[in-house]
């Protein structure tokens, strides 16, 4: 995994609450266990007018020119609810999103997001409403996120957010569960060498 310390990107306003994981990546596309290839199916039933995904829905925000290169998603409360599929953050990151900002997230999605190096930022509803107003007035605006300082710069306003210190550390240093384990490889090897032969 790569280090994630700062990110600046165009903001995509998805003005919907309770966006569930089936809306993020419909179940018919969950036929792989690798993380790549899901981006083209992100929000499939909203992005496209046909099952084959060949006719973009011009009314959906991701198909509108100011937002087509977006990498920061702005949403309403309870984002990522529904089933506990890891494919949901995989689809978001494979599409190109690095950050999702919302008043609240479903618990399982929130944890899965960090595992996929997708940063979920929680702000209160008044702050989220102000951000939607800002993006509506300036389509294509970019926000800047600083993971180390836990700040979000949106226009002339700087917001602060809180991350669990361990999750923040893992993002900054590009560590997942495997990377954390490998940091202790020598200690693991020493332990294995001391074990009785019949247990090896």
Swiss-Prot record:
Any Pfam family matching the protein: Aconitase_C
CDD domains cross-referenced by the UniProt entry: IPMI_Swivel
Catalytic activity: (2R,3S)-3-isopropylmalate = (2S)-2-isopropylmalate
A GO biological process held by the record: L-leucine biosynthetic process
Organism, as annotated: Edwardsiella ictaluri (strain 93-146)
Protein name stated in the entry: 3-isopropylmalate dehydratase small subunit
SUPFAM superfamilies, per the entry: LeuD/IlvD-like (SSF52016)
Lineage top rank: taxon: Bacteria
Gene Ontology terms: cellular component: 3-isopropylmalate dehydratase complex
GO molecular function terms noted in the UniProt entry: 3-isopropylmalate dehydratase activity
Record-stated family: Belongs to the LeuD family. LeuD type 1 subfamily.
Keywords: Amino-acid biosynthesis, Branched-chain amino acid biosynthesis, Leucine biosynthesis, Lyase
